[in-house]
Regions:
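Rossmann-like flavin
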Residues: 2-110
Length: 110
């Protein structure tokens, strides 16, 4: 039964629907965190420097680029970045620089 349910999600329509739901969940989570901070005054080491993902093979990078484009359609500010831009964003990746094909970056994530 589980296998059939899994296979039913392996199509473009289900992928788009699931991405939309993940984006909605992420937006809700981000808003809820802001509410908790505002209402409680809780302090933590909050850093909003964004989240970078890097890829070491072209196929994975192309899939991530397609997903980033889809997410942009739902309002997520995730963008595709070159290896050079990724290394400017996160210099600690320099040791892997030659292996990196490219990446994605979401500035508003923490």
């Amino acid at each position: 039964r589980w296998g059939l349910q899994f296979l039913a999600q392996c199509n473009d329509a289900a992928f788009e629907r699931n991405v939309a739901q993940l984006v909605a969940l992420g937006s809700y989570s981000h808003a809820a965190l802001k509410d908790v901070v505002r209402e409680t005054g809780i302090e933590y080491q909050r850093l909003e420097r964004g989240i970078a993902h890097f890829y070491v093979d072209q196929k994975s990078f192309e899939g991530a680029a397609a997903a980033a484009d889809l997410m942009a359609g739902f309002g997520v500010k995730r963008r595709v970045v070159s290896r050079e831009e990724l290394l400017r964003i996160e210099p600690a990746l320099a040791a892997y620089g030659e292996r990196i094909v490219g990446g994605t970056f979401t500035e508003t994530d923490e």
